[in-house]
Amino acid sequence: MLHYKFHQSTKNSNDLIVLLHGFISDQSTFDEHIKTFTDEINVLTIDLPGHGFDQSSETSTWNFEFICQLLDDTLALFKAYRIFLHGYSMGGRIALYYALYGTCHLNGLILESSSPGIADEDDRIERIQIDQARAKVLEIAGLEIFVNDWEKLPLFQSQYNLNTETKRKIRQMRLQQNPVRLAKALRDYGTGQMPNLWPKISDIAIPTCIIVGSFDEKFIKIGYHMCDLIPETSLFEVKGSGHTVHVEEITEFDKIVLGFIFKEEQND
């Protein structure tokens, strides 16, 4: 079972949003959303393998099938709720996999800056090599050097515009992670290890919401491609945001998520 926190709604709501974070993060990345969400719905935040307070055994292989089973075990505790599964980046890849192979019924899927994997085999092998090299940096150079490099990636350039306190909190959260377990996470379920789900996503039979930032050209392209393939999909391009929409545009993110959930509630 995954480490989680349940945040009960102040209303008598049967809706539950499950929030899956990205790499070198944990469930605290969603702290700024809890108040707004619980004013309307219930929230479940989760620490994925190798992150936060997760206790997954390092002798296990943390592949997508393994994580899917852990998520099955966790969501089974909340099967009385209408479950909406959200995932950001790495968490979005897990959410996509779960939507196809998980056993607990989902009422909706929310994908933030996410991808169904790498279609080209040569590109996938190249990404595995990148993930393995980054894992070695974590193990040899240490967490602070890795975080310094991670913060400079073009993917996170728009985070430079965040206020000083927010940037401090993000950096502190990253530096609180365990470098050995992060390295294992990269090797076991990094982007390169994800099965290519592009041929499968047309089988997703639940309402799906795709969220991308207007500065994130790569994931805008991926998002629109997914939108063409998943039968019941809506896409939201958030102005003024990069890859981490839930961090960079908190109010707009909350509005999109709650709007999607309320719309599906009315359709049921």
Question: Where on the chain are the PLM-derived regions?
Answer:
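Conserved HGGG/HGGXW glycine-rich cap/lid loop of the alpha/beta-hydrolase fold
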Residues: 5-56
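Active-site loop/oxyanion-hole signature of alpha/beta-hydrolase fold enzymes
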Residues: 44-86, 255
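Catalytic histidine-centered segment of alpha/beta-hydrolase-like enzymes
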Residues: 241-250, 254
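Short beta-strand/loop motif that positions the catalytic acidic residue
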Residues: 204, 210-212
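Conserved alpha/beta-hydrolase "acid-adjacent" motif
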Residues: 217-222
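Gly/Ala-rich beta-loop-alpha elbow adjacent to hydrolase catalytic centers
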Residues: 87-91, 95
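Flexible "cap/lid" loop of the alpha/beta hydrolase fold
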Residues: 100, 107-139
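Conserved alpha/beta-hydrolase catalytic His-Asp/Glu region
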Residues: 122-125, 137-200
